[in-house]
Amino acid sequence: MAETTPSRPNDTPENSPGGGDDNQSQSAGQSKNPASVKDRKCQYCHQAFTSSSLGRHLDQYLFKKKPDGVHDVEEIRRIRSGITRRQARTSSGKRDTPERAMGKGPSEHFAGGEYGAKPREGAIRMMFNTPTWHATGVINDIPNPGQTPEGSRFATSQSRTGVIHLPDYASRGASAKDPDTMRALELALREVLDNIKAATSRMRPRLSPFDFDIQSETFPSLCLRLLPPPPSLFSTNPFPSPSSFPLKPPGVEHLDIVRQAIRAKIDQWQSDQLSTQSANNSPGRPPLGLDANMISRSAQQHEDMSLRHLELAFKHWASLPPETRLEAWHLEITRAFAREVEKRKTLDEQLARVQQEANQLRAQVEKLGSCQWPREFALFPPDTLPLPPAVARELDAKESQISPGSPRWDYDSVVAKWKRVVMHDKSMGRVGVGYGNPPLDDRSSADTKARATEEPPASAALASTSTSAPPSAHPPPRALQPAPGPALAASPDQSSSHTGGASAPSSQNTSPYLRSPQAGPQAKRPRLMNGADGGHTSAANPSATAPNTWNPHSHQSLPGSNLASASGPPPSSGA
């Protein structure tokens, strides 16, 4: 059979719409063919090129070919640097723009300055995924050493606007947003308090005008505590002044001076109390519960009590003999010196702590100024750990293993250690340690107890069954054959000697999680449905007529059901 080859495809009818579309597409393709003809000429060598190949031809003399004396390299560089070059090959709509269509006209001639249009002034163009000239064959942004045209200025502005330099603080706190890091910081830095609030908090005024117990002082000790030292105390020949304490045992002339000093102390305390009470009346501060009348009454009480004690102390001092007064005066001077030594020691410790806090606050201010302070510390500044000067000197020792430069005090090391702890706790919580499934745990514990209670009756029943029936007459069903497990592999003699009745004890001693409900050897773990192994129950009791399903909530029905199934008649050979 000779068939003529049709002029069009067999699956396309002659008068179908698809055929018309094909003809239209072919005609459209034929109409576009003349657009790719070589309608351009090089103004130097007068060779014919297409509109795209002419640019590549001129670019050859800028980068690859050497000057041949025919093509003007400087003129070509000036022309090619001011044109708008095409971008990616996948961009659509570039070839059909009005500027492109106008450029294809026959009236356009290749001339210097007219080949490419200048970019629009004021327009900001962002180009992403710009291919290189190795991929497209078109070289962009050709520099011109002679002058600075519009194209180079546009390229410079484009490079400035295209690359966005993010500040360092934009990504500085990225690690603080990590939950593990935040938890590690919480464990590493346990104490976080508001240092700024503590530094600006006002102190409560003293409840007493004196910083000592005036009722326990003698007259010479009151003179040493309330009166100032003589101005000429450190001179060659010191002498007392009328308002200072004496260099010899005090007498009756110092009674009025001490009385005036007591009243001055109480008046100063009352003035401080009144100023504090007026400051508390400002809005935003909680009141201290003091008013002017209460302060005045308290000041009067302190004055009466202090003056009364002063009179009693002076009477006792005046009744002593001169030798006893001299010894008591020397003793009070020694006590005053010892008190000042203790006070100096306490003040030194407080000064060291204040200096440490000042250094920490200064470092915090520097970090805040340079935007290096973490966000968490801005909310909860860390507390200052008071370190005695002796401990600080030990830490600064060069040979010490606990110096600040030691790796054990490194921030990254401490945070990494606690981060490992946090991740470990999280992984353990996800796995289930401490968060186990209660129904599954109850199921396994109940099954273990049931198997422990039913082992002696089951073994006795199986022993009587094995003695009454020969092993060859009643082969065990396939579903009751023991699965290959660690217990059977350890005792192969027991499995080979008891072929008829060893399957039941092995199935009972084997955990239900290690047996398959299907026949044959175990391939994978059985799936528990609603906390019970239904396949195991049906396979272990093939001859039971009543449904003896295992209930996870009734633990007492397990031994009876298993004993009934174990002591039942073995399956007949004809089944």
Curated annotation (Swiss-Prot):
Question: What are the UniProt keywords, alphabetically?
Answer: Coiled coil, Metal-binding, Nucleus, Transcription, Transcription regulation, Zinc, Zinc-finger
Q: Which domain of life is it from?
A: Eukaryota
Ranges annotated as UBZ4-type zinc finger: 39-66
The protein's GO terms of the molecular function aspect are: zinc ion binding
Any one Gene Ontology cellular component term annotated for this protein: nucleus
Q: Where is this region: Disordered?
A: 1-40, 79-114, 429-575
Record field: compositional bias (Pro residues)? 472-485
User: Under which name does UniProt file this protein?
Assistant: Transcription factor ncaA
Q: Which organism is it from?
A: Aspergillus fumigatus (strain ATCC MYA-4609 / CBS 101355 / FGSC A1100 / Af293) (Neosartorya fumigata)
Q: What is its main location?
A: nucleus
Indicate, by first and last residue, each region the UniProt record lists as having compositional bias (Polar residues): 1-15, 22-34, 493-513, 538-558
- Bias class Low complexity marks the residues at 455-471
